[in-house]
Amino acid sequence: TDLIVNGVKEIVLNYDIDSICFDDYFYPTKDKNIDKSAYKSYKDSGGKKSLQDFRRDNINNMVKSVYSAIKSIKSNVTFGISPASNIDYDYSTIYADVIKWSRNEGYVDYICPQIYFGFKNENQPFMQTTKLWCDNATCKLYVALPMYKSGQKDEFAGESGKNEFIKEKDIVSRQVTYLSKLEQVSGFYIFSYTSLKDNEETS
């Protein structure tokens, strides 16, 4: 946590920035060996929490520490996180309690889930996934959109959705239109703008 907090402090102190945004990487695996010694020390000192809750606490404390560090230097600089769009995955696999952060003060100013799916995705269709976040997040909500998928086959979208970004050229623009009508959504991010550079067919 100290290494991360100090890195953020260096950026906020030395650069004229508007915001710090973390990507969706937290615990890299469920493997118990990666923090075996830290968890053993915790248990030996009387800790009662499961490994899963221990990890979530570590991430929560890191997020809260980063937020506090930023605000102590420049209160106008915002802090947000762009997590994976699957809330259950965030909580159970990478130990990121995104709902806690988005519902309680002192963690983030905004949340920006990576809803990198088309409307026909069989696992996480865009509209339903967006609604889930609207129903759960109470902080400022942005949505990250999948410009990089334009013109590409989506192997993990199921049979009905795998060719959606090839056949339909206006998916991202329709997503922007849809988001603009939702009171809970404050805006959107594009991943990534490099997808606009050399592809005239990009939607």
Task: Give the positions of each predicted feature.
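Polysaccharide-binding and catalytic clefts of secreted carbohydrate-active enzymes
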Residues: 1-104, 116-117
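Substrate-binding cleft of secreted/luminal carbohydrate-active enzymes
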Residues: 105-124, 130-203
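Alpha-helical scaffolding within the catalytic cores
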Residues: 63-65, 85-100, 122-136, 171-175
